[in-house]
Amino acid sequence: MRMATPSSAPSVRNTEKRKNKKASSKASVSFGAPSPLSSESEDEINYMTPPEQEAQPGALAALHAEGPLAGLPVTRSDARVLIFNEWEERKKSDPWLRLDMSDKAIFRRYPHLRPKEDRPDAPSHAEDAMDAKEPVIGSILEQDDHKFYHYSVYIGGGLVMGVNNPSAAVCQATIDVEKLHLWWRPVWEPRHPLDSAELRKCVGMTVPYVATTVNCYQVCCWIVGIKDTWLKRAKISRDLPFYSPVQDWNVDPQEPFIPSKLRMVSDGILVALSAVIGRPIKNLLASVKPLNILNIVLSCDWTFSGIVNALILLAELFDIFWTPPDVTNWMISIFGEWQAEGPFDLALDVVPTLLGGIGMAFGLTSETIGRKLASTNSALKAAQEMGKFAIEVFKQIMAWIWPSEDPVPALLSNMEQAIIKNECQLENQLTAMLRDRNAGAEFLRSLDEEEQEVRKIAAKCGNSATTGTTNALLARISMARAAFEKARAEQTSRVRPVVIMVSGRPGIGKTCFCQNLAKRIAASLGDETSVGIIPRADVDHWDAYKGARVVLWDDFGMDNVVKDALRLQMLADTCPVTLNCDRIENKGKMFDSQVIIITTNQQTPVPLDYVNLEAVCRRIDFLVYAESPVVDDARARAPGDVNAVKAAMRPDYSHINFILAPQGGFDRQGNTPYGKGVTKIIGATALCARAVALVHERHDDFGLQNKVYDFDAGKITAFKAMAADAGIPWYKMAAIGCKAMGCTCVEEAMHLLKDYEVAPCQVIYNGATYNVSCIKGAPMVEKVKEPELPKTLVNCVRRIKEARLRCYCRMAADVITSILQAAGTAFSIYHQIEKRSRPSFYWDRGYTYRDGPGSFDIFEDDDDGWYHSEGKKGKNKKGRGRPGVFRTRGLTDEEYDEFKKRRESRGGKYSIDDYLADREREEELLERDEEEAIFGDGFGLKATRRSRKAERAKLGLVSGGDIRARKPIDWNVVGPSWADDDRQVDYGEKINFEAPVSIWSRVVQFGTGWGFWVSGHVFITAKHVAPPKGTEIFGRKPGDFTVTSSGDFLKYYFTSAVRPDIPAMVLENGCQEGVVASVLVKRASGEMLALAVRMGSQAAIKIGSAVVHGQTGMLLTGSNAKAQDLGTIPGDCGCPYVYKKGNTWVVIGVHVAATRSGNTVIAATHGEPTLEALEFQGPPMLPRPSGTYAGLPIADYGDAPPLSTKTMFWRTSPEKLPPGAWEPAYLGSKDERVDGPSLQQVMRDQLKPYSEPRGLLPPQEILDAVCDAIENRLENTLEPQKPWTFKKACESLDKNTSSGYPYHKQKSKDWTGSAFIGDLGDQATHANNMYEMGKSMRPIYTAALKDELVKPDKIYGKIKKRLLWGSDLGTMIRAARAFGPFCDALKETCIFNPIRVGMSMNEDGPFIFARHANFRYHMDADYTRWDSTQQRAILKRAGDIMVRLSPEPDLARVVMDDLLAPSLLDVGDYKIVVEEGLPSGCPCTTQLNSLAHWILTLCAMVEVTRVDPDIVMQESEFSFYGDDEVVSTNLELDMVKYTMALRRYGLLPTRADKEEGPLERRQTLQGISFLRRAIVGDQFGWYGRLDRASIDRQLLWTKGPNHQNPFETLPGHAQRPSQLMALLGEAAMHGEKYYRTVASRVSKEAAQSGIEMVVPRHRSVLRWVRFGTMDAETPQERSAVFVNEDE
């Protein structure tokens, strides 16, 4: 005999039952199902395993070796094994396939196993049957079923398959198999018999069934793969007569089923309904074209509805309305697989949504329904308990009368199936389990579970019949486990574990750190508890070893360092290691941990004279030296004091400094056996990330199989998976997929992927297996497995799935188009009826007419000279009435200056409205004087517009403009008449001023009074009850919140939510007079009082010696509130004032004072922050203005100088500018190039984005992790800096810029070369003293507009000019002293850190770009309005990093808080408060901006990829310079989600070419732009070249003194030769041709300007720019002759 080995699969074996015998010669007793492994009866001989098989434990099924039964199973158990094997293999391609291991299936598959007494005798019915030959398998049979014909597919053995029993004429039917029992005849036969097994795969599938279209014949066509329909039936041939179902090959057919009359009536109704939606009726309507006939009768009126009607009629005329294009194929392409199973699946998705909508419509929620069902639930539980009791009693009675069968044999049968599955898995997947640690562990775990279950059964049933079976099962489990362990012990290689050795002095916390590190690494590998230990010293027993992923080896070398080194060499190797164990069950245990963490006190891993020093050092992947100066200092100060040492240690191990030696190193200095390397500072997070990455890298290198893509199972799904793994974008994937549909072989399909990198993989196509890959544009295809035996019927199941989905899509499209067609038809008919029935008015016509003499046209203007049209009044797009204080009515800059002079002369009590009235009055007087001078006194005065309007109103005349302003329905009553209003007022209704509980919980005790939580971040209170400055509040330090005040109103803003349990409320600046609000008074005794207050006006009230600003109110509790205990008392200050505005509760202020009677109260309201830090000098200030400026609140009058109307740009030649050339920005209303608004209006347009709402913050946990990772990165790379002195801070400032507020002078005027003198000297000294004392100073910024070259669209189109912020000199000095050292440290590391401030494009650029080129993907983004979209919360997180890394953190914290507090910006007329956006103008602004850019980009990448920030930074390279960026990464980023994340943060990212849409990523660095330079590469490296447009602009324009006419020319100056030389260097990078063009223009300019300069050759300039030399000795191969040619 030969053996067959099935593959593995989970299954549950059905309990085997014996057939009932008609006659039995011998009585037998059975205790259930016979044992699968042994038999005690002759009747069950078919279940026995032959004796010769018991000696072969590896055999799973016995087959006949010779004779007529060769290759067939010996027993039924063997047959089950073979059936299981076949099912396991076919299940991979057909997951829906069911496992049938019953006796019926066995006898049908293997008839020789059927007992003789069970085989039918096949009675003869020759007298009733007309003999017919058995049809060919796969034939379509037409059967006479009374009123109609029924079709099915013959599959052999007298069985037919198809939709034999549909439940209704329109339903979801199931493909089934039944006996042939109707008169039949074959109407279609295949050329060759089809595979019956392949046909049977369709059994059990569901298909849509419609009696008139998708019926039994259509399903038969789907099964056999022919193209035909029931309406055509072109493939049917009716040459043969009908035959009787009783034949020799069809025994005992069943009686035909005759449906009832009710069933026939219901089927008729369903058929009629389906015919309405079906296409025949629509085709008939399309041929008649009823809408086209209607369109001939009626015409279009060219209204909106008429146009819609015309489009409908045109659609009908061109046959696209009633028969729209078939979109079934397009809908099918959306689905990756044909998996739609029918309306049931659709109902699972749609029904919950519909039920939810119905519940919402009726106001039902889960809470209300839960309350209603609570009582029902309790009653059901009681009834359930009673029912359980009754069932138990009933079971006992039934068991006494009819004993049940023993369930143990069924359990044993199930266990045998599971063991067969494991044995098959061991046989077929052994190599994969040995290579994959998780698969091997899962296999052993399943064996342990099965062994436990078998032992439970053996302990429960101790009879002899069960004991033999359980023992045999246990033996098979032990053999499987032993076979796996033996195979694992015989491996020739394994994954080498990662070794981390931490060396340092004792007692500094190394062991605790390593334990924590082990847990973190284990958690990163997927099992946090998988941490073990290695026995040390003389203990050499590994019984406690459980195969943990991470093991800890403490005190390496404590006893015998040479012995420990030998053990380390053995464990940290790829050769398998068998451990020494004492217990017999642990014999043969292997060491398979992935990470080994070692602690030691030695300075070197092993002695330097050790013979295998190099081998040991090579096996240590991370040699880390731990130092703790803090612990050493504590021990030195307090020897023997354990508490002092513990106090010096930190739970985050920040007291330990870790230094990473180079790989293979053996000491602290970085020496290796091959020379000296570089040591690095590393953190715990980075060490953990590197170790985990190395583990995964080695595991991937140790992998066994490539990915497999099965195109036979599903072409679309396999292609999508293959393209996604190759990194092909979705839009390119769709284009390649369309081309691949026409490919006939794998070679053609791989040729389409030649432009992409396809890793080696396997492809299954048409039964054959191919090894394919595409590396560096070379596709490779190798056939490794030929297809199996050819079959005439291929993938019939797939065809049915495809046809079924196509049918569903067609049905859905038919229903939708039927609804649209009905709606369109109704609309067209209604439109025509409504058009003919509505009345016609003369004003409906689009033309004017006159009836005769004296008639007038009401549509024409009455421009007859005696009146002027007033235009529309009321609110329009430009506002209501006359413009306010911030709309200058088109005033020029001179008129605006005149208005300011008049305001100053009148003491500030002069508005723009007054100025406009005075100007109009003066113009009228001037006109009158001129006319008197010309015509004399006798000439009548000319009527002004205002006088003419007054005269018309007096006479009762109406102008044409008034007539046109009227609406046609002015005389119609809108809404119901007042007489029909039946509403009534309930004068007895009681008004409840009590606030809900959720608002009362916001009132908390604070300081000496109370406070109120507006949101989780904002807390308000009265200023005089708050604790002193610098006090910790609600557990938060002063650095975690900002404080602003307005009078006695105090507001705290916390950076992180203190009360996340409460939603945000609306905080308003007081309310309108007459509003009734509630003051929520809380007392320490627990009393809560809600007092109604009618709010009055805003006022300043003197209470004692203090003046309180707020809103007054009158209590509605009576004349003497305090006497009745219904008023406020001392201690109630800080309680909130709230009122309900619509359905929303609003808080308007806090309680600060009350009169003695208690009837009048005062609420401090939320105004703008006071300017208490400002030191105003000079005469008394004017009353502080109120209102807003460009949406931003006004704080005070401004002092900034007027905006400049001059430019520093001059033309280099008088030639005309080329089209599209850039020009200096707009210069104001005097600009001769264009007639535009004032510069103040341009500035207001630039300020508006600062008042817009901000975006959302990144998730808190992601933001915290990103900030920690960035801080760790900077802390490990930046060198410690020394604080700057006052002199160095002054020297670092640019002396050619303005000093800002309050002097606004150039800094060089008061600079002696070493110090500031005069006014600026006093200001700088005062700021330096405030810094050194750690006191706060509020920065005051000055707004200006940048003078720069811009696109013509920003001058002649929509005028734009960039906004500049200039800080005062004091803020510059304080910021330079606080953050100057940090900025210098960043500049020194600009090549290694992502912040590139301070980089040189020609010197540092090649190194930076080379780092980017090491990664796979590259992207750059251009951000719109970067500064105005920034959030102060993100800037504060960036500022916290700068503060912690500055040399003086305590003093730097004060400066950073001042910089990030609400900014005070001087715009000339006013000082405004800006609470959001980036405040610029300080020495550290660029670094702060770049750091915030780094945080936002990293947060977006972490949120999209869900990868730890340290790993993201390890797999990526960033370059940030303000808002400019370049990002390179190896991670697979979803660019749509990445772009949406950035927009969710409030940013406005666009592509580099300013196109809208998701950001694009490239697989090459070529073409990425950074700092206006395109990154290109050649054989010598990467470099950045300036774009040609910038080079051309520098040839057209030069800088000089300010002037008004930008087109004036300036002769050559002293700096121009160096500028032109640098320009030649930039042009040399674009190739010799472009260099010659620029060189000729430079020579021409030099000749015209009298500049003496020599233009070098292109090659010399290129050497100078690229390699820093112009010598002729430069090697010829480095000249890059053919590299930089023009594109």
Curated annotation (Swiss-Prot):
Effect upon mutating residue 1422 to A: Almost complete loss of RNA-directed RNA polymerase
Binding site for Mg(2+): 1420, 1422, 1524-1525, 1569
Annotated residues for binding of ATP: 504-511
Biased composition (Polar residues): 1-13
Domain of life: Viruses
Site feature Critical for determining viral persistence, where: 94
UniProt-annotated stretches for the region Acidic: 893-898
Interaction with host EIF4G: annotated span: 978-994
UniProt name for this protein: Genome polyprotein
In-chain residues carrying the UniProt-annotated modification O-(5'-phospho-RNA)-tyrosine: 896
Pfam name, any one: RdRP_1
Gene3D superfamilies according to UniProt: 1.20.960.20, 3.30.70.270, 6.10.20.70, 6.10.250.3230, P-loop containing nucleotide triphosphate hydrolases, Trypsin-like serine proteases
Domain Peptidase C37 per the UniProt entry, residue ranges: 995-1172
Native source organism of the sequence: Norovirus (isolate Mouse/NoV/United States/MNV1/2002/GV) (MNV-1)
